Amino acid sequence: MLDYTLAEVASAVRGELAAGSADARVLSAAIDSRAVDAGALFFALPGERVDGHEFVAQAVTAGASGAVVSTTRPRDSFGDLPEAFGLIMVDDPARALARLAGWHRRLMKASVVGVTGSAGKTTTKDMIAAVLAESFSVLATEGNMNNEIGLPLTLLRLQPGHDVAVLEMAMRAPGEIAALAETARPDVGVVTNVGYAHIGLLGSQSAIADAKAELVRALPAHGFAVLNGEDPRVRAIERFAPGRSLLYGLSPECSVRAVDVALSEDDTSFAVALDGQAVPDVRFTVPVPGRHNVLNGLAALAVGWRLGIEPEAMARGLASFRPSAMRMHFVQAPRGFTVIDDTYNANPASVRCAIDAALQHAAQRRVIAILGDMLELGDAAAAGHAELGEYAVYAGVSGLVTVGPLAALAAESAVQAG
């Protein structure tokens, strides 16, 4: 819960308190009038289909203490408002939301961990939160609250009792992660990989790597970067770290290294060497299949290690991890079928990981992959889908069902591959 005056908020967002009592309290923030409760500050954000300015009256009815609105809207356009209802006029309500979140973050004692990457960032974020929760009070991104609107709303849930905030950072264009980092001011930056996600928007993997590097560049001198040592493009980002950095992976040069990896139908386990020294008497288990989850788990352990958590506590935290909805979610269906729901989002790297995890879980059973179109791949779309068809065959998938014109290229490629 927040507890600021309207005057304090107006100053923080660089706006003008045009109506209402300067001493009125702001207890929360909302962008949806249906989610407003007593004391909330309603941010009237313009959207493609609806404009928040049309719902200020509903926010009043729901008990909001005020609204942040654009200076382009005349005061009388909101109808008859209560005398005590605050109106803060700003140039850009979305930017004002980010400013309030950044100001609030600076008043809290919590450290901030930022997580980005082309694939695996949600799973890695959830694993980091699970590991840290063994020793700290943790706030973590929920659902898809990882953009210029969701991240500020998450930060505004930060309380004095929180020790750490683990924030997922997504992007669709250069500069977006830099803007998120300006708001969140991360102390730790985690980059999982550089793949083909959004290559249709950014143009090349090099451009994607540059965008991901914005998180590392934003770290303070006392912060540290946690980077996937198995991805050459991520390793190259290390040179941008203002402070300390470490690599995680399976290679000997990685500071946090997995050894003795064991894959089973239901989980993935491994031992760990830290700076070349084996962690004795502790084995780490991720309760989901998939070799890629070794790397996700190592990222979480690297953060936990740097924040001083004991190995035994980290092992307990990692074992408690549960995936978010529609991300490698296992559903037991009738007649002995297992449905693996990984439908939230897809790019070539994440689909390969899903296929590998399904085959690992299936053991001797048949695996049928259902593949839809992967979007925002630009010029790489045709090749990306075709390569997945080949990969499915060579990996051992028994059948492939495709939906959509791009996914049909995967089916054609699978037939040609046998």
Features from the language model and the residues they span:
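Residue-level signal for inorganic ion chemistry
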Residues: 9, 40, 59, 100, ...
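Active-site beta-alpha connecting loops in nucleotide-dependent enzymes
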Residues: 47-50, 324-326, 343-417
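Acidic, Mg2+-coordinating active-site environments of NTP-dependent enzymes
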Residues: 74-82, 188-338, 365, 390-393, ...
